[in-house]
Design a protein with these regions (language model features):
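Surface-exposed, charge/polar-rich loops and edge strands
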Residues: 1-288, 293-380
Length: 380
């Protein structure tokens, strides 16, 4: 399929620059996969729109202050006798670093700008010299591998020096409010460089109402990284290669998913990150088990390749596009995504491309708010 098949026009005025207040006041577009019909609603109505026996899977990753501003270290700046203030005067050109994936305690993959002339061995200083990064090598997709050095643990330095990595279509700098609002209420596992935005609409009150209705809620962890916002450069989408993202599925969650599948209870994924983790784990489990069983890929029901989910840590570079089966997920809660993006293509694979683009056209006409801080869809 061609990338142009997933384009739509969006007025800039509909790109949300701030979140809705309160969280659950966001609008929600309900889309039925089987018929393509839609209905306008609000997120606060979610508990009333569900059957009550769903398994809701959420992403508990926490966004870190992954955006850093520093300077390249000049030759004169390498004199260890210089004070931080004097040393700052000898730093050369400014550098912006966007962390994308943690490799170890002090090593990260990162996007660096400008990075074209940043060779291996180059050093970058942040703040008054309390944090440094050394360029180890180039990784895939044009990112650099960095090793950080500092007197304090890296997490503490990031909290002090880093900025919340708001997406580029939010045309402002981050502020103190974003440190709370660009996190979901489920967030407790640090490591993401973007929020799992479908989770931003939940409140403790909504969670309590869902549980009172009989909805079971479990968690996965997927540290959102470069794979989420990496653009597609090939005209044919099948040629795109996703950047790997780490995820973890607990024993409790794996068994809950398997039990729900056996009992034919709907599995509702809160966001595309949950979809990628569950669907990748199902494929890995099926491959480990041997020959695949027959796949039923009827529209409106999940394909039953494998109801087995292996718990543990893994990496996913799964790219879901139309024609591929969904093995686990039955329903999807998701925000509105950028044109021609991997996320829009994933949702098109789940909902049907024509269904989704018609629903998006309605959302534009009805002035829904788009992207990370915008409104959402419930697709079932």
């Amino acid at each position: 399929m061609r990338l142009d098949d997933f384009h739509y026009d969006l007025p800039k005025r509909l790109i949300a620059q701030r979140p809705s207040e309160p969280r659950d006041s966001s609008r929600m577009l309900l889309l039925e996969r089987s018929s393509g019909e839609w209905q306008d609603s609000t997120f606060s109505a979610l508990p009333d729109l569900l059957r009550g026996d769903e398994l809701l899977v959420v992403n508990n990753t926490r966004v870190i202050p992954a955006r850093l501003f520093g300077h390249r270290v000049g030759v004169r700046a390498q004199n260890p006798g210089k004070s931080p203030k004097t040393r700052r005067e000898h730093l050369s050109s400014p550098i912006e670093v966007m962390l994308t994936r943690r490799l170890s305690e002090n090593e990260w993959e990162a996007l660096v700008r400008p990075g074209r002339k940043l060779p291996t061995g180059e050093r970058i200083v942040f703040g008054e010299g309390e944090l440094e990064a050394e360029v180890l090598d180039r990784a895939e997709f044009g990112v650099r591998r960095l090793r950080f050095h500092g007197a304090a643990p890296l997490e503490q330095s990031l909290e002090r020096l880093g900025h919340i990595p708001l997406p580029p279509y939010i045309a402002r700098e981050d502020d103190p409010a974003d440190h709370e609002r660009y996190q979901t209420i489920f967030a407790h596992e640090p490591g993401a460089v973007a929020a799992p935005t479908a989770g931003l609409h939940f409140t403790p009150e909504i969670v309590a109402r869902l549980r009172a209705r009989g909805v079971e809620i479990v968690e996965i962890t997927l540290a959102v990284g470069l794979g989420t916002f990496q653009p597609i450069h090939s005209e044919e989408i099948e040629g795109h290669v996703m950047h790997a993202e780490s995820y973890e599925i607990s024993e409790v969650t794996a068994r809950a998913v398997e039990k729900a599948k056996r009992e034919r209870r709907p599995i509702l994924a809160a966001g595309t990150t949950v979809v990628r983790a569950l669907e990748d784990a199902a494929r890995k489990s099926a491959a480990h088990a041997g020959p695949q069983v027959a796949v039923s890929a009827t529209r409106g029901a999940s394909a039953q390749l494998s109801a087995r989910i292996e718990p543990g840590r893994a990496e996913a570079n799964l790219f879901l596009y139309p024609g591929q089966p969904f093995l686990i997920v039955d329903q999807l809660l998701t925000n509105f995504h950028l044109p021609s993006s991997t996320l829009l293509i994933l949702v098109s694979a789940f909902a049907g491309r024509e269904n989704l683009l018609r629903a998006y056209a309605h959302a534009v006409e009805a002035n829904y708010r788009f992207y990370s801080y915008g409104d959402c869809m419930l697709i079932r």
